[in-house]
């Protein structure tokens, strides 16, 4: 069954394994999450657990948010996300989910929001090749032909535009270390997002098969 936690990307560092191998890791701070709601098929049409992360100031919370938090006997949260495919009997409204949910060696999927790069051209945005630089060439970084038949730009054509700020999931990363007293997970490799951005860590369904 799926297990997961919400956290914050702190940055990257490197640690040594017991065998003396240097491993680059991403540090994720995941203070205890609060179970805000347990959704069932009878009441909601599907099964899920709703987790809340990071307290939100009362003055910034509206009445529905405060009422939702009161049911879980907690304060309003900045980030609320749902986990599906979980064992509902393991969760109770108002209980906490900590980093000890995971252990070293677990394989996880990490979801975050990619860093924004503003308005970019085809070469940076879609990794296309440059045009010739010499011999009278008049195209170097332009998108190129839009097509010669249909007198319009076909849907899905790779063109310049806004790059980044998309939801990205990297699968099958390994939990290298769990520091329970500091609410920290160290995950091998890099994860999407800028520093201090919200991260969702879930157990990998593919790895368990």
From Swiss-Prot:
Keywords: Ribonucleoprotein, Ribosomal protein, RNA-binding, rRNA-binding. Coiled coil: none annotated. NCBIfam families: L3_bact. It comes from Lactobacillus delbrueckii subsp. bulgaricus (strain ATCC 11842 / DSM 20081 / BCRC 10696 / JCM 1002 / NBRC 13953 / NCIMB 11778 / NCTC 12712 / WDCM 00102 / Lb 14). Gene3D superfamilies: 3.30.160.810, Translation factors. Belongs to the universal ribosomal protein uL3 family. This is Large ribosomal subunit protein uL3. GO terms for cellular component: cytosolic large ribosomal subunit. The gene is rplC. GO terms for biological process: translation. Residues 113-155 are annotated as: Disordered. InterPro entries: Ribosomal_uL3, Ribosomal_uL3_bac/org-type, Ribosomal_uL3_CS, Transl_B-barrel_sf.
């Amino acid at each position: 069954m799926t297990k997961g936690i919400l956290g914050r990307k702190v940055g990257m560092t490197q640690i040594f394994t017991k065998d003396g191998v240097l491993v680059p890791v991403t540090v994720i701070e995941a203070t205890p999450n609060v179970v805000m709601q347990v959704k069932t098929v009878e009441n909601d049409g599907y099964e899920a657990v709703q987790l809340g992360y990071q307290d939100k100031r009362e003055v910034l919370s509206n009445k529905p948010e405060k009422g939702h938090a009161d049911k879980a006997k907690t304060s309003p949260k900045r980030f609320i996300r749902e986990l599906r495919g979980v064992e509902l009997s393991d969760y109770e409204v108002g209980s906490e989910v900590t980093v000890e949910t995971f252990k070293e060696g677990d394989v996880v999927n990490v979801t975050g929001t990619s860093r924004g790069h503003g308005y970019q051209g085809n070469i940076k945005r879609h990794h296309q090749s440059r045009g010739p630089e010499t011999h009278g060439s008049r195209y170097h970084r332009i998108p190129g032909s839009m097509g010669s038949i249909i007198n319009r730009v076909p849907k899905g054509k790779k063109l310049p535009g806004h790059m980044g700020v998309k939801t990205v999931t990297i699968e099958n990363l390994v939990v290298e270390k769990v520091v329970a007293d500091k609410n920290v997970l160290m995950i091998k490799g890099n994860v999407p997002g800028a520093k201090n951005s919200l991260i969702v860590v879930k157990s990998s369904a593919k790895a368990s098969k």
